[in-house]
Amino acid sequence: MSAELQDSTISAALLRAMAAGAEVRGTTSPNPPVGAVIVPPAGEIVGVGATQPVGGAHAEVMALQEAGDKARGATAVVTLEPCAHTGRTGPCAQALIDAGVARVYYLHADPTPQAAGGAEVLAQAGVDVAKLEKPPHVEDALVPWLFAVRTQRPHVTLKFAQTLDGFTAAADGTSQWITGEAARDWVHADRAHRDAIVVGTGTALADNPSLTARFSDGSLRAHQPRRVVIGKRDLASAGDAASHLRELGYEQYDSIEEALYELYATGARDILVEGGAGLASSFLKADLVDAISAYIAPLLLGEGRGVLAHPVTQTLAEATRFHRVGMKPLGDDVLIEYVR
């Protein structure tokens, strides 16, 4: 059995594994965006892997392939308990055993009945196994997937851009652009890590959005989220009002409940709701917002359109209080992130 690694080495390996998982977020659903690293006794990382799109290799297998023979006697650090079942790919726990890995650290237990049990399989094969604690102030790409598995619906993030005094558009209806280029680039990077972008029919008709994930030069990013519209108004005969969505393709559902059911059933686990005010109000009223991404611009309007179209609670005591988990300057704007 190889010597145990220092805690600092394990912590660094976990951060690298979490980063690898974050890089593939949005491309793996319905599978989780897992990251894995292989670290021999000397302490250097020799293999890094992340979950491939559905049907492809899991993170552990990718990391083992990169590590090669150096995996024997090494430590694997994985963001999710290695799976113990055979689906489209073989069980990762067995792959680690076959590679001669001496110990495995994992961040989250696998909550799915069909895949759980990898830690026990490893232990029975003589591999040392231990569960790690999440490092503070580090974004965890598995949170939406874990939530979706637990609740059987997609994790919902509400995103909006507003002025300092809370408006998303001026009195004349103009809203392009409230935020600057850095914030808009960040939005597109975020879109590329989501399974679906959701808007209401009002926004689809008024703004003619593309709902794509683009680079600053206008070119498309590698991963494009599903484009989803909620509402009963017909977009097919709307002329130029919704021409981009008709050209690119979109899904439309009559209600939030139908949308969430169908999206989950077809593999979506992590969705971004971008508006408008009516849809945002409806999601909040239904208690279906799990996180908020608020982009705040250094503008004051005094009058205009607000984030919400109608009240979602009657009293402060009844209001959902979100907790701030992140704050990021983006040029002169700032992104504030909240979770329930």
PLM regions: where:
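Zn2+-dependent cytidine deaminase-like catalytic core
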Residues: 37-137, 282-284
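Internal, well-ordered alpha-helical segments in soluble enzyme and binding-protein domains
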Residues: 92, 114, 118-121, 134-142, ...
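Proteins enriched for Cys/Gly/acidic motifs involved in redox and nucleic-acid/cofactor modification
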Residues: 26-30, 56, 119, 128, ...
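Solvent-exposed, charged/polar functional surfaces in cytosolic regulatory/catalytic domains
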Residues: 20, 66, 144
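Enzymes that bind and transform nitrogen-containing heteroaromatic metabolites
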Residues: 2-31, 47, 88, 155-157, ...
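Generic short beta-strand
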Residues: 36-37, 159
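Active-site beta-strand termini and strand-to-loop segments that position acidic
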Residues: 40-41, 150-151, 339-340
